[in-house]
Amino acid sequence: MHPLRFNLTNSHNPIRKNRRVPTRRTCIIFTEGETEEGYFKKFKSRCKTVKGGSMLKIVEEAIVQKKNLMRNYDQYWLVVDKDRTSPEHFMFAIQMAEMNGIQVAFSCDSFEIWWLFHFSTINSRVNPMDYEGTIKKYVHDYSFRDKGILQGAKMWLALHSRLDSAISNARKAHSQCKTTNEAYYQSVTTVYQLVDFLNKQRPF
């Protein structure tokens, strides 16, 4: 008895013909800190830490690094904290980044608010000093003082099962802001936009 043979290269094969493999879009992420870098590397993303001090300086450095890259990417992102940046400087920095082809995932006040959205929606301003107590209810060994690539990777491992909730909660808080001027946002992050994009690029 002869073994069955299947010609997988035949154009008449319906399985082969109808199968579509989505193309992953390439992306590079400039991050203000190493914690963010460690977190986003868990999405198998290319990351580069940007040093600059003020938000405007960070944007300027990201633009320089983008121009010095050896290859092109489909998307360029910058992850940055608003911190104490004035509304005028904040909007100027955002506009400068976008004019140079860099999308900005910003957090008001700091990136760690993204951790909070994994557990609940935030409807009012949360003092960054209160982040730790809330997060420790779910990640018991968490410390706000722990920073760095390993800390970012650790938080990804601890929280990635709640990713859909975090995206939904952060999107809801963003959409409910009473002003359309992002410079006056409080306890909001647009990191969910970047994470949503990366999550859709992951192979399953």
What role is predicted for each listed range?
Residues 2-8, 13-24, 37-50, 68-75, ...:
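C-terminal accessory helical subdomains adjacent to catalytic cores in phosphodiester-
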Residues 28, 77:
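Hydrophobic "anchor" residues on beta-strands that sit immediately upstream
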Residues 32-33:
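Helix N-cap/beta->alpha junction signal
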Residues 51-67:
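A short, well-structured beta->alpha microelement
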